[in-house]
Amino acid sequence: MMDPAAGSGPDGAAVMPPELPALPVAAEDPMALYRQVLRDFKELFFCLEPMEITRYVHRNEGRCLSLGPPKGWHVMLRTEDGIITAAKQAASKLICCREPLTPLGYAVILLPEPRRDHHDGMVATPYVVFMGRFSRVYAYDTREKYMVLVSHNLDELARYGVSRSEIAYRDVIHTTLRRMTVPVPRRYPKGARTMHVLFLNDTTPEGSYATAERILGCDVKLHTPGYGTVIMRLMKTVQQLHRIWPFCALTEVESRRWWWAVRANLATPWYVLGVTGRPRPGRSFVAEVLVLLDWFGAVYAIQMDDPNHYVRRVANTITEFFRMGLLKMVFRHRRFERERQRQTRMEHRHLCPHHHERAVDHKRDILFNEDAALPDERRERERRILQQQYDWLCLTERFDPHEGAWERLDPNTLVLHRYDTNSQSYVLDPDIVGVEAAEREAAGHQDDTGPRLHCLVTTRSSTREGAERVITALVHQSRLVTYSDPFPLKSLTGVREYIQI
């Protein structure tokens, strides 16, 4: 991909981007990023037409605007080049309605000051950032040819940034970050146990693994950014699943129907990784989400309380899964791609973000006096109302200086959700999901050595080299290793895209 930091002016002369802005080193102020996004996008917020946005990008080419959390994500303003033009054409075909998408530039990650050197002050990404109506922000992946809705409006962008989007957790991004920065060891609480999850078969010659904090036995913590931490119980076989609810209530015929449906949906050999849920003292573990891997390492999930039990992809790799958890289930319906590609990848279908805009446009026509004889009067009124809205966004009384957004003050409040998130889902409290109770129980079992390595492997390999392929360092750290072989794929007649379980 072309370096987003370089560009050319209208006369063909090279345009050098301004010096990269300094990132805040300290994190004492939890609202610093929120205010930074509001400041950076202020002029764009008042742009009434796509051409105004384009002129702003031309005037400020090379400037970096903050995209909010995670810290470091910015959009570097760039006028249209070949890549951006192609991305704009592709994105316009993916969007569900006729919404004008104006390119802002490339998404980049600025490195903190201590980690920058003379040449590498940022990490380029394959994402082109667009702005739509009502300050909606989209990002188009030029490699995998899909687009995600980053935020519905400026307020959501300032609060959550790209933390609700899958683009922030891709392996390609984090691999580049590790290569360009000083490695920082992951810190776990004092006395914490860890579990390595290893995936290894003929499709992954080098193998891949992720590390999770282990609670007790095969229970590990799975964190979903913006949602919370839940308990995930790693499983090896279907027989182990029959010990937990609701699988323990299935008859043999119903169980066979389940696994046949999973096999038909994935169309490859597959592994059981485990289930998320909550333990019940003296009773069966309650499974809420079943997590599977296909032969190529992609991670899928089945929501148990969904009557259709659709199999949906939640991550491309096991490392991405333990990095973003169930993000694509909690904040779903934000991905736009070709229908055939969506069906092949088994992604959630997007929901139209323009659902309520007809009523909004009607109210705007009333407020902005569309019937006014002078168009300048209408534009002046529109800018005045936008200024009032922007001033409201900047009110400090909307937030608590220590807790962040005002709705976080009430632990029983509903998650701030739209129609594309899980409706009526309460803010995850550790006591509700059983994390704190499990930690208290684990504290009483300090002598627990338990499994340290969970392997998803092919023990039968066609080559000697494959049979001897092992990550030795992980095995030596392990007091007890568990193995999970893939379930075999039996040929099916015909093509069945989606089979309800």
From Swiss-Prot:
GO terms for cellular component: viral tegument
InterPro entries tied to this protein: US22-like (IPR003360)
Superkingdom, natural source: Viruses
Compartment(s) of residence: Virion tegument
Keywords: Virion, Virion tegument
Family to which this protein belongs: Belongs to the herpesviridae US22 family.
Name of the protein described by the UniProt record: Tegument protein US24
Species of origin: Human cytomegalovirus (strain AD169) (HHV-5)
Name of the gene this protein is made from: US24
